[in-house]
C-alpha cells in the first residue's frame, strides 16, 4: 500500500488513538498502526485497571468528541492524597470550590471502547491492526513503514 497520509502513528493505544482523533479534528489524516488485536483489547476482563484523567486531558477528550460517550462511566477526582510508603507525612491536594475537580477516573476498557468507536467513525483515520511493522524509514522528505500484512 502506498496511501499517503499526513501522519504515521505507530501505536494505537490510549495516546496514539487520542493523537489521531485530535489531528483529525484539525484536518490531518493519519495511518494508525498497532500490533494488538482491537477485539482483545476491548474484551471484557482484558484489563481491569483504571486511569486517572487530569482536567487538561479530560478537556482534550471533550474536544475530540468523547464526552458524551465517556461521562456516564467516569467519576470525579475530588481529592488526592500522596503517601511515601511508611514515611511520616502526606501531601493532600484539594481544589478550591471554584476550580471544580482534579480530573476523572475511568476504567481503561471504557477509554479504549470510546476511542475505538470514535476512530472507526473518523474518515481521516486509517486504522491498521493487528499488524506488525516490518520496517520504517525516516528521511528529510517524510516517513514510511512496511507492514507485515
Regions picked out by a protein language model, each given a short descriptive name:
Residues 1-9, 32-34, 40, 141-142:
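Long, low-complexity, intrinsically disordered polar/charged segments
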Residues 5-32:
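N-terminal Rossmann-like FAD-binding beta1-loop-alpha1 element of flavoenzymes
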Residues 45-84:
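N-terminal FAD cofactor-binding segment of flavoenzymes
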Residues 73-149:
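Conserved N-terminal helical subregion
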Amino acid at each position: 500500500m502506498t496511501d499517503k497520509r499526513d501522519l504515521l502513528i505507530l501505536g494505537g493505544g490510549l495516546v496514539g488513538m487520542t493523537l489521531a482523533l485530535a489531528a483529525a479534528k484539525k484536518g490531518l489524516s493519519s495511518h494508525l498502526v498497532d500490533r494488538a488485536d482491537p477485539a482483545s483489547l476491548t474484551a471484557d476482563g482484558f484489563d481491569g485497571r483504571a486511569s486517572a484523567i487530569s482536567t487538561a486531558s479530560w478537556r482534550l477528550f471533550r474536544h475530540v468528541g468523547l464526552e458524551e460517550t465517556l461521562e456516564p462511566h467516569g467519576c470525579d477526582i475530588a481529592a488526592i492524597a500522596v503517601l511515601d510508603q511508611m514515611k511520616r507525612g502526606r501531601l493532600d491536594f484539594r481544589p478550591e470550590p471554584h476550580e471544580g475537580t482534579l480530573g476523572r477516573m475511568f476504567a481503561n476498557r471504557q477509554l479504549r471502547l470510546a476511542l475505538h468507536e470514535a476512530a472507526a467513525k473518523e474518515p481521516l483515520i486509517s486504522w491498521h491492526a493487528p499488524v506488525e511493522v516490518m520496517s520504517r524509514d525516516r528521511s528529510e522528505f517524510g516517513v514510511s513503514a512496511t507492514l507485515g500484512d
